[in-house]
Structure formats: C-alpha cells, structure tokens
C-alpha cells in the first residue's frame, strides 16, 4: 500500500510503464467490507473501494492502464465471506448462497471500476492459482482444481464445488458484456512450464469455454 505515496516510485512508473498491477489494493480482502456486508438489506457483500480508487485514479491521470488483480483467489479471501451473516464463527453458507455472493461480488467490482474509470482497467485476472500441485487436488479431475493449499482447505471448493472457477468466469463475462466494455478476462497461475500443470490448465480453460465463456 505504501508505494502509492512513494514519489520516486510513481515517477519511475510514469516514465517507464504503460500499465500497472496492484499488489494488494484490488484483492478481495482489501475490497470486502464486513460491517457493510452484515448490514446489507439484500444479504449480498458490500465493498470499500477507497484504497483501490486512489491507485486507479492515479493511473488514469497519468495515462496508464491497470490490470485488475485479482477477483477470485482462495489464498486471499477474507474467511467471513463464506459464512452465515458474514461471521467466521458461524457455519459455512450453502452452495446456492455462495454462488449468489460470488456473482454479486464479481459484478460489483468490475462494474465499479468500469463506470468510475472507463477503459482504465483493461483486463482482469478472474481466478488465480486454482490448479493444485502434488496432493492438492482430486486425481480424478483432469483440471486438478485445488482442494487445499499448504494443508488449508480451499473454501471456494468446500462451499461451491470444483466448478467455482467456471462460475467465476461466467459471472465476469456476463458483467463485461452487460457493460459493453472491452475488458479481457484471464486465468492466472505459476509453474505453467511443467507439463502436468500445463495440461491441467488447458483442460480447465476448455471447461471454462464450454461454459459459454471466452477466457483469454
């Protein structure tokens, strides 16, 4: 967050870059507002865009594009997002409720930045690192959707199931199309040069596209 106030760093970006990616400001744990979510009349999540807006506004003022990073990442979601009444001490919500929350969250985030800063956020990493390695996935699943990360359960998998990735892309594509925006949608991961992981990502991409979604 402090890089937003580092004049030397910002001057470097203006001189040498045409696109920036937020380290933290656009991740769910920076955007989701627990108190507002608990008080929402429709039960859907609410956001606080203040930190992210500062970064995107600076990019807009200086003619830089922004890569949105990231909408869905099991490693950086606030735990209470998955629980009844947005309270981590209460039971996990049902698949139906979690899908509603996921759709609302993705729709709100993409819409906010496109309407407030038209054309600045030119793409989104919709889902990050969903393909597991080693024993972190069901071996019968050719997509190798992550069930755990370093021994910790993937709560998206626990609440929605292995198709949470496809639904995330579906909701993102529907939002972009409704806005009439030129925003590209990406799946992001690491170690993609390993054959096993590469093949799983290819299988996942095909599954996403079979959901009538064009993942770039």
Task: Identify the meaning behind each predicted range.
Residues 1-2, 55:
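Short N-terminal signal/transit or membrane-insertion segments
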Residues 2-15, 102-112, 197-208:
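Short, acidic/polar
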Residues 15-36, 41-192:
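Substrate-binding cleft and catalytic face of glycoside hydrolase catalytic domains
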Residues 186, 191-216:
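Substrate-binding cleft/loops of secretory-pathway carbohydrate-active enzymes
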């Amino acid at each position: 967050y402090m890089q937003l106030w580092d004049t030397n760093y910002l001057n470097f970006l203006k001189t040498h870059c045409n696109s920036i990616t937020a380290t933290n400001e656009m991740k769910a744990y920076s955007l989701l507002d627990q108190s507002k979510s608990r008080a929402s009349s429709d039960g859907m999540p609410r956001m606080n865009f203040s930190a992210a807006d500062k970064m995107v506004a600076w990019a807009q003022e200086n003619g830089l594009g922004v890569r949105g990073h990231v909408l869905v990442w099991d490693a950086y979601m606030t735990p209470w997002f998955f629980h009844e009444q947005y309270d981590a001490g209460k039971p996990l919500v049902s698949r139906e409720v979690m899908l509603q929350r996921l759709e609302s969250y993705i729709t709100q985030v993409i819409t906010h930045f496109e309407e407030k800063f038209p054309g600045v956020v030119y793409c989104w990493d919709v889902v990050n690192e969903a393909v597991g390695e080693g024993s972190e996935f069901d071996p019968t699943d050719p997509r190798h959707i992550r069930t755990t990360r370093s021994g910790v359960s993937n709560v998206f998998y626990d609440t929605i199931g292995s198709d949470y990735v496809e639904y995330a892309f579906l909701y993102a594509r529907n939002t972009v199309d409704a806005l009439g925006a030129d925003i590209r949608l990406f799946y992001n991961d690491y170690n993609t040069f390993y054959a096993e992981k590469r093949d799983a990502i290819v299988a996942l991409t095909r599954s996403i596209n079979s959901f009538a979604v064009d993942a770039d």
